[in-house]
Amino acid sequence: MSQNFFRTKYFAAFGVAALLTMSFVASGAVAQMKAPTAREIVKEIQDHVGVPWQKETVDTFKAGNPDTPVTGIAVTMMATMDVLERAAANHENFVITHEPTFYNHLDVPEGMAETDPVWAEKRAFIEKHNMVVWRFHDHWHMRKPDGILEGMVHELGWEKYQRKDFPYGFTLPETTVQKLAAETGTKLGSSVLRVVGNPDMKVTKIALSPGSAGFERETHALERDDVEVLLVGETREWETVEYAADAVTEGKRKALIVIGHIPSEQAGMEECTTWLKTFVTGVKIEFVPSKQPFWLPK
């Protein structure tokens, strides 16, 4: 046999071996690039959140199959239809929301039939786009510091004013209730704030209660001598609002600023997005802000 024959067989064998090697490498790369499931990502969150995971919690899957491979993560304050549509358009099929998706704290609307057209269309949209919705509320608040509060303090630029003995309390440079409300609205991107109290009252002692803490915690904050103004997300008008109005009428140096639930916690979920990126890899993570639903008539 000629040397050319052996050379040809050698290169043929080498070529087959190279192809096999490339095939194995490629298959290994595919295995490494396999998209994580929503369930796997939640397990990572549980491992990194830094507080014991509670059995009784609203931090559970609300829609979709948890074993769905994740194409992208949309982190949001509230999984409204608008947020879901934007997430789907960006190929983000795993939505992590702070607040309920289906109009009730437990995501089971009381007194609403499953045939309700709004509820039904929202469920159908999630199913059509192979989306998974998971709530991250309790344990994000349980972190030290509270994840929502941390994000809000950063957004407001109040880090240097925050009290060590009372993390929800702040000692600001002297301002008025009017200026405080206006500056808060500007920083949080909301023009729809409501205020109880004298707009010209000079204040320095502030308390921040994001979201909807409830009457007991809100009034306990307002009754403190070291709190002149309480900023809340939302509250019942016949509870904390009435209490604040009575305090003002009685001549007490008190004011209440109602920010709105979404803008009062939104920056906290943007903070969550940044935190997730420190340990969740191999998948796109984006903060999708919820829009302020209210507007002012002109």
For every predicted segment, state its role:
Residues 2-15:
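Bacterial N-terminal signal peptides that target proteins for export
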Residues 8, 20-298:
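Hydrophobic structural segments
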